[in-house]
A protein has these predicted regions:
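Glycine-rich flexible loops
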Residues: 1-219
């Protein structure tokens, strides 16, 4: 997509997420990698519901900002995800309510914050590990996510999301629309898991294998 199209998609995605309650106040950030290796990212402390295309931060492939308002404090995290996964063209971070609540109540496993309880979770989201708590913007978080993602790519099972303990999910995909779809499925699964009291059996290995065979699910 062109830089102009990317700016418009970032603003439209931010507005949609804000209107539907996936982000609040100035929480969350969003970026798109452009064809030349540079990327656009939302400004620090910006409300995703009121983004303006011309105020988005443009950052070169070298990490140097060239225009726009000051880039999000999670700039390093976005850059490290793009470095680890060549297929990633959009990174999205929110403070989604049920996912944050899940980290406070206790996740299923460190390597899978919720179990595979629905077929669409397996097909659209996949494994979501829990990143240890660190302050927002801590470079150590970016390093952890990069190393975890790089290992999954090398193993042939690339991740689409990680969960930052007490902060929120980080998801990535080929476009803002696809990243948003992953976020929504992940948040909905966390909501279901909490709603039922976290006491339902996950899909069986045979059921998950059927999803692999029928739909190419990566699990």
């Amino acid at each position: 997509m062109t830089p102009s199209e990317a700016r418009d998609q970032i603003c439209a995605t931010g507005l949609s997420l804000h209107q539907r309650g996936y982000v609040h106040a100035t929480a969350g950030n969003l970026s798109v990698r452009l064809d030349d290796g540079s990327f656009l990212i939302t400004p620090t402390d910006a409300c995703l519901g009121t983004l303006q295309p011309e105020r988005l931060a443009h950052v070169g492939a070298d990490g140097v900002q060239t225009s726009g308002d000051r880039a999000s404090k999670t700039l390093a995290l976005h850059r490290r995800i793009y470095a680890a996964d060549p297929q990633a063209r959009c990174v999205l971070h929110t403070h989604a309510t049920h996912l944050v609540a899940l980290t406070l109540a206790g996740v299923w496993q460190a390597q899978d914050i919720v179990p595979p309880i629905t077929p669409y979770y397996v097909m659209k989201v996949g494994h979501v590990p829990l990143a240890p708590y660190r302050r927002p913007g801590d470079p150590a978080t970016a390093d952890w996510v990069h190393d975890t993602l790089a290992a999954s790519v090398a193993a042939g099972r690339p991740l689409r999301a990680v969960m930052l303990d007490r902060l929120g999910p980080v998801v990535w995909h080929r476009s803002p629309a696809e990243a948003s779809a992953v976020l929504e499925e992940l948040e909905e699964t966390a909501r279901l898991w909490l709603l039922i009291g976290r006491n339902v059996a996950p899909l069986s290995a045979a059921q998950i294998d059927e999803l692999r065979q029928a739909f190419g699910a990566v699990w």
